[in-house]
A protein has these predicted regions:
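Alpha-helical structural segments
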Residues: 4, 8-15, 19, 33, ...
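Conserved hydrophobic/aromatic packing and binding residues within compact polymer-binding modules
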Residues: 9, 30, 41
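Helix-turn-helix DNA-binding elements, focusing on the entry/boundary residues of the two helices
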Residues: 16, 27, 38
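Short amphipathic helical patch at the helix-1/turn junction of helix-turn-helix
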Residues: 21-22, 42
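Ser/Thr-centered, proline-biased regulatory motifs
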Residues: 23-32, 49
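Short amphipathic alpha-helical leader/targeting segments
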Residues: 27, 45, 53-55
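Short hydrophobic/aromatic patch on the recognition helix
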Residues: 35-45
Length: 68
């Protein structure tokens, strides 16, 4: 369940960053979009920078797989 919530946070954050621009999206916006508490979001990620780091890591992993 925790892994699923983590993936949902990453998916929502990516969509929101692309639609609204990363500087315009806060962790509270992401939590509101997913209808979870900010505390739940912070259980999975330290801050917005942590979310961004994980999105880049996920992108790298997908590119490595695609190019292999």
């Amino acid at each position: 369940m925790a892994r699923q919530t983590r993936q949902r946070i990453l998916d929502a954050a990516l969509l929101m960053f692309n639609a609204q621009g990363e500087p315009n999206v806060t962790t509270n916006h992401i939590a509101d979009e997913l209808e979870i508490s900010p505390g739940n979001l912070y259980y999975h990620f330290r801050n917005k920078d942590d979310i961004i780091e994980q999105l880049f890591q996920r992108y790298e992993e997908r590119m490595d797989t695609a190019l292999a």
